[in-house]
Amino acid sequence: MALRTKNPNRQKTEAIESIKNDVKASSAFIFTEYRGLKVEQITELRKKLRENACTYKVVRNNFARIAFEDADIKDVDSWLTGPTALAMIAEDANLAAKTLFEYAKDAPALVIKGAVVDGEIYDAKQIEAFSKLPGKKDLIAMFMSTVNATTSKFVRTLQAIVDKGGAQGAAPAEAKAEAPASEEKAADTPAEQPAESAPEAAPEA
């Protein structure tokens, strides 16, 4: 009895559609060669990338080529040679690039060929330089630190103005408090007696 086998053309179509869907769902792609990596290493790398919203997928070059052509992404054919695995990134390409280059330090068999980030083409050197830049999370942290420092400085300046105004405001209050005392002292002092009238002149003879 002959075993039923899946239609190879259908398998091909499904594989291409799967890559197409991944391409549509991603904003960046990093092309790598995994020749020489062990299965457990690929599994470990996938796990690390998944933490950064990145899928690491081994692809057939001709299928990937069709998917990228369909998405109108050009100039990637030179990277679709040899054993190819794609890092397909939904969010922060910088974090995924950092992860790949950090992993490659301990696993030199992993080769980063190039990347497409937001429609821009990066060769191997450019994507490595990109990986060394601060990521979105780092930039947000730096921004918040600057905002907090500026706010703290503003609050201190405002408090200094308030404190200075309070010191100046105390002087008029003290002056007002002294005024009644002065008036009271003046009231206790007897008024000067009017000078005695000069004697009337004697009538002329």
Curated annotation (Swiss-Prot):
Low complexity bias locations: 169-180, 190-205
BP-aspect Gene Ontology terms: translation
Keywords in alphabetical order: Ribonucleoprotein, Ribosomal protein, RNA-binding, rRNA-binding
Region Disordered: start-end pairs: 167-205
GO CC, one annotated term: ribonucleoprotein complex
GO molecular function: large ribosomal subunit rRNA binding
InterPro entries attached to this UniProt entry: Ribosomal_uL10, Ribosomal_uL10-like_sf, Ribosomal_uL10_bac, Ribosomal_uL10_bac_type
Stored HAMAP family: Ribosomal_uL10 (MF_00362)
Role this protein plays: Forms part of the ribosomal stalk, playing a central role in the interaction of the ribosome with GTP-bound translation factors.
Record-stated family: Belongs to the universal ribosomal protein uL10 family.
Subunit architecture: Part of the ribosomal stalk of the 50S ribosomal subunit. The N-terminus interacts with L11 and the large rRNA to form the base of the stalk. The C-terminus forms an elongated spine to which L12 dimers bind in a sequential fashion forming a multimeric L10(L12)X complex.
Protein name: Large ribosomal subunit protein uL10
Organism: Treponema denticola (strain ATCC 35405 / DSM 14222 / CIP 103919 / JCM 8153 / KCTC 15104)
Lineage of the species this protein comes from: Bacteria, Pseudomonadati, Spirochaetota, Spirochaetia, Spirochaetales
